[in-house]
Regions:
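A detector of single, family-specific signature residues
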Residues: 1-391
Length: 391
């Protein structure tokens, strides 16, 4: 058995190679983060091993820094283990009382961790390509949050420039309102528009939903508006709406790419009422290979949804707060999906109502429903069977 620990960094990687006896075959080699460095590492591994040797390569999950070297190792057929940094930190502290942490020490710790035969599962080629879906879903998540902040800015600016408008439309964030404000961002400008022009603008943007009556209503409100005349805010509002439109176009493009992958996967969890394409994609992308998890509880822990526990002597915590460690994207996807599932699925709606009847806070009851949903998702994905709605 040959164990290779790699401490990943931005510009260089530190490597340590141990054999099954714990003897150092190559101590703390430093390679640059480029193709020459990767080839140097591969050659060093070949020089230190025989064809009959079983090889394990371990590295920490360091996000985008580890992505390229991970792909190189997998392409060259080396069994690679991606380890949670929390685990390596705890393991290193268990080996020594000294607070020594260097790249070389980390590389040796990872190699020793592999040698100790702790319960680790190798990173599969399927998991590597699953990163494509994860990249898309996380990218969409960030874009949606960015757009939400811009929408808040629109609401703030409208409150300053034309506060009466919000009561005349179902939402400020609809095509007809954006079309109006992108051309006439203030109440004073809207009040001076010719009625025919305003009617045509609203009718075109709303696809016929709004006509002359709505145009008169908006123009009359603009003429008596308390909105301020601030050219700087006018410009900010027009630019903000432009950015929202661009982000919406980008999000639509991302969703098309996600849809293509999900059409190929056709996962069983889509058969659960209330689970949509985007939510399912994020859940699957963050969990990855379900065989890496022995039980649904492991997935909950990975998402940081498990209750934290604290006990010392006679002291035991009365209110177990959520751990909130692990993937925040998975935690977000699970909780938001649970809300929709509880709305559309009678079984989950009844379960949520039961927990609420027991006196639990809504968020606590929802966390119980989330655990139930994770158990269902785990069962469906492991069995490959679709969800059957009870008659």
């Amino acid at each position: 058995m040959i164990c290779i620990g790699i401490d990943v960094a931005k510009d260089k990687h530190d490597c340590c190679i141990l054999d099954s006896d714990g003897t150092i075959r190559a101590d703390c080699i430093t390679i640059p983060n480029n193709m020459d460095g990767f080839k140097q590492l591969l050659q060093t591994i070949r020089d230190c091993t025989k064809k009959s040797d079983k090889i394990k390569v371990g590295l920490e999950a360091t996000g985008h820094y580890s992505y390229n070297i991970l792909g190189f190792l997998l392409d060259n057929g080396l069994p690679t283990y991606v380890i949670n940094p929390l685990h390596t930190n705890l393991y290193r502290n268990s080996l020594s009382l000294r607070k020594t942490k260097t790249d070389r020490v980390d590389a040796r710790t990872i190699a020793t961790m592999l040698l100790s035969d702790v319960d680790l599962k190798s990173y599969t080629d399927t998991a590597y390509h699953n990163e494509e879906l994860k990249s898309l879903t996380r990218y969409r998540f960030d874009k949606v949050r960015e757009r939400a902040k811009l929408k808040q800015s629109v609401s703030r600016l409208v409150t300053i420039l034309f506060p009466e408008l919000e009561k005349l439309v179902p939402s400020l964030h609809i095509a007809s309102v954006y079309a109006l404000l992108s051309e006439y961002p203030g109440a004073k400008q809207i009040s001076e528009i010719h009625l025919t022009k305003l009617t045509n603008l609203l009718a075109t943007a709303s696809k016929g939903r709004y006509g002359k009556d709505k145009a008169i209503q908006i123009r009359d409100a603009a003429r008596t508006s308390i909105g301020s005349v601030m050219p700087a805010k006018f410009l900010e509002l027009k630019h903000t709406i432009k950015l929202i439109r661009e982000l919406t176009s980008e999000i639509d493009e991302i969703e098309v790419s996600i849809q293509k992958i999900m059409d190929e996967l056709n996962p069983p969890i889509l058969s659960i009422p209330g689970v949509g394409i985007q939510s399912a994609a994020m859940i699957l992308a963050e969990i990855g290979d379900f065989s890496n998890f022995e039980s649904p509880d492991k997935i909950l822990a990975y998402a940081g949804c498990s209750p934290s526990t604290y006990q010392s002597g006679k002291l035991t915590n009365c209110y177990a707060h959520m751990e909130k460690r692990g993937s925040r994207y998975l935690r977000y996807a699970l909780y938001n999906t649970t809300k929709y599932v509880c709305h559309w699925n009678p079984v989950f709606a009844e379960y949520l109502a039961k927990k609420r009847a027991e006196g639990k806070h809504y968020n606590v009851a929802l966390s119980h429903a989330t655990k139930k949903l994770v158990r269902l998702i785990y069962a469906l994905q492991k069995s490959g069977k679709a969800y059957l709605v009870a008659a």
